[in-house]
Design a protein with these regions (language model features):
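Conserved RecA-like P-loop NTPase ATPase core
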Residues: 5, 71, 105, 138
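N-terminal beta1-alpha1 ligand-phosphate binding loop
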Residues: 1-27
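S-adenosyl-L-methionine/SAH cofactor-binding core of RNA-modifying enzymes
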Residues: 32-33, 37-98
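Short glycine-rich anion-binding loops that position phosphate/pyrophosphate groups of nucleotides
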Residues: 11, 75-78, 106-109
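Loop/turn-to-beta-strand initiation segments
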Residues: 2, 97-102
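Structured adenosyl-cofactor binding patch, chiefly the S-adenosyl-L-methionine
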Residues: 112-156
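Proline/glycine-rich low-complexity loops and linkers
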Residues: 105-106, 117
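Short hydrophobic segments within beta-strands
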Residues: 6-8, 36-38, 103
């Protein structure tokens, strides 16, 4: 199975980029993992929130194939403990999913078209995090999930 994380906009926080890079390298030991960054929408001051979400959504949909399992990282998604997240990943792998795509939306969330296309939603917390910090949290949790599946001594209950 291939796993991809799609994010809107580049991060300007070197510390976040360093963490994401570190966990990406570690993850590639277990699974093919890639991050795709969609360029920020230009001239956002002239756009409504819904127009910005629509444009971001169009860019995201261009990267998704019909057979992909699309999971949105969304505040209204299912909350899982790390072990439950690992179990969900294992079920996806066993079900024959070829490409599992996670998406971190832009500052206003996702367009209706993205919500309609999504197969599921996952929440990392009831708290709100910046979209930049979510990249580091998510890649760490993904790495943690694979160490759980391999019974490696990273995760402690």
């Amino acid at each position: 199975m291939n796993i991809e994380l799609i994010v809107v906009g580049k991060t300007d926080m070197r510390e976040v980029e360093a963490l994401v890079s570190m966990y990406t390298k570690r993850l590639n030991h277990y699974v093919r993992f890639a991050i795709t960054t969609i360029a920020d929408v230009r001239n956002t001051k002239k756009l409504s929130e819904s127009e910005q979400k629509r444009l971001e959504g169009e860019a995201i949909l261009k990267l998704i194939s019909e057979s992909d399992h699309l999971m949105l990282l969304d505040e209204h998604g299912l909350e899982l403990r790390s072990i439950e997240f690992a179990d969900m990943l294992q079920r996806r792998m066993l079900s024959g999913t070829k490409r599992l795509v996670f998406v971190i939306g832009g500052p206003y969330g996702f367009s209706d078209a993205i919500y309609q296309r999504a197969n599921s939603k996952l929440s990392l917390s009831k708290m709100t995090f910046s979209h930049q910090i979510v990249r580091a949290i998510f890649t760490e949790q993904l790495y943690r999930a694979f160490t759980i599946l391999k019974n490696e001594p990273y995760h402690h209950e």
